[in-house]
Amino acid sequence: MVKKNTFFANKNLGQNFLVDSEVINRIINVINPKSHDFMIEIGPGLGALTYPICKILHKLFVIEHDNNLGTRLLKDISNIEVFVEDVLKFNFLNLINNSFKSVRIIGNLPYNISIPILFYLFKFHNNIIDMNFMFQKEVASKLLAIPGTKSYSRLSIIAQYYCDIDFLFDVVAQSFYPIPKVTSSFVRLVPRKVFNLYVRDINQLSNVTALAFQQRRKIVKNSLSSLFNDDALRKLGIDPLLRAENLSVKQYCLLSNHVC
């Protein structure tokens, strides 16, 4: 197990530190970092992944909101660059453009902001090779959900539009300190280089899905009544009596293009 030292988790930052060496080794194996990889780690915490990865890479970039943790890593590791910043305000393009390479991103994401982080990273999808993240299992289920299931959500649609997504494995709560109340899942997201669905304006896809899932059990003729009448829905091949959770990613793309 990784030593917890004298650091205490900051609940406001959603910190749950990975401390299980078996899980850490498994993550390193599935990420399979190469010495030349341009890699960014979000939320390194106590350095459970940071230390072993830095033994492989020429250099690792990390984004850590907690100044104490960031300073500790900088003191201990020579081939690391630490940005003590809020990841939701971090300009990834500056770093990417300066390196002239596409990036791999890894992290044990803070549970309380994992979804906002993901939506923020989608903005940089053209410059990302893959993202390997630890999520709360409930979030992982939403990422992978198919239409008609309880977990299917706006997150499912946006994430599946942008990425190919693979579930890698679950991680029990006892692998973290402090022990969370939930199981976690390690997931890989690979941004598409060629989109298999056409979306004219991603903002419209975001707006349509947000509107539809405000009340997911409503039929779409009601939840989307401000945008579409029955005839418009039928012309797009969509049954007005279906609920938001029953429409496919492709159908949401059609709806968003019709609004543009």
UniProtKB/Swiss-Prot annotation:
NCBIfam families in alphabetical order: ksgA
Record has Transcription as a keyword: no
Catalytic activities: adenosine(1518)/adenosine(1519) in 16S rRNA + 4 S-adenosyl-L-methionine = N(6)-dimethyladenosine(1518)/N(6)-dimethyladenosine(1519) in 16S rRNA + 4 S-adenosyl-L-homocysteine + 4 H(+)
A Pfam match: RrnaAD
GO annotation, cellular component aspect: cytosol
Gene3D superfamilies cross-referenced by the UniProt entry: Ribosomal RNA adenine dimethylase-like, domain 2, Vaccinia Virus protein VP39
Similarity comment: Belongs to the class I-like SAM-binding methyltransferase superfamily. rRNA adenine N(6)-methyltransferase family. RsmA subfamily.
The protein, known as: Ribosomal RNA small subunit methyltransferase A
